[in-house]
UniProtKB/Swiss-Prot annotation:
Belongs to the HTLV-1 accessory protein p12I family. Pfam families: p12I. It comes from Human T-cell leukemia virus 1 (strain Japan ATK-1 subtype A) (HTLV-1). This is Accessory protein p12I. GO terms for cellular component: host cell endoplasmic reticulum membrane; host cell Golgi apparatus; membrane. Keywords: Evasion of host immunity by viral interleukin-like protein, Host endoplasmic reticulum, Host Golgi apparatus, Host membrane, Host-virus interaction, Inhibition of host adaptive immune response by virus, Inhibition of host MHC class I molecule presentation by virus, Isopeptide bond, Membrane, SH3-binding, Transmembrane, Transmembrane helix, Ubl conjugation, Viral immunoevasion. Lys-88 seems to be associated with tropical spastic paraparesis/HTLV-1-associated myelopathy (TSP/HAM). HTLV-1 lineages are divided in four clades, A (Cosmopolitan), B (Central African group), C (Melanesian group) and D (New Central African group). There is a cross-link at residue 88 (Glycyl lysine isopeptide (Lys-Gly) (interchain with G-Cter in ubiquitin)). p12I is a homodimer. Interacts with human CANX, CALR, ATP6V0C, IL2RB, IL2RG. Binds to MHC-I heavy chains HLA-A2, HLA-B7 and HLA-Cw4. Ubiquitinated; a fraction of P12I is degraded via the ubiquitin system.
Length: 99
């Protein structure tokens, strides 16, 4: 019932109503949040780094079953540029390594 009464109001009006109904101590607690704990701030760079590494290796996880499946011939599993050692690589333009 309360939801039906409040649903025509905009989110800004609902926020103003909520702040009006709360006691002043709760409002100041909502507006002035304490800073995060120092241990969490130290852990944040490691979380960001692990997320970036996961995104970097994500394509490898999807192609790993295809690369390891024995039903495909080796020419399909490994492109030609992977099958040659760097000093025996066939001559090709440098832009070919970008694709």
């Amino acid at each position: 019932m309360l939801f039906r009464l409040l649903s025509p109001l905009s989110p800004l009006a609902l926020t103003a109503l909520l702040l009006f109904l709360l006691p002043p101590s709760d409002v100041s607690g909502l507006l002035l949040r304490p800073p995060p704990a120092p241990c969490l701030l130290l852990f944040l760079p490691f979380q960001i780094l692990s997320g970036l590494l996961f995104l970097l290796f994500l394509p490898l996880f999807f192609s790993l079953p295809l690369l390891l499946s024995p039903s495909l011939p080796i020419t399909m599993r490994f492109p030609a540029r992977w099958r040659f050692l760097p000093w025996k690589a066939p001559s090709q333009p440098a832009a070919a390594f970008l694709f």
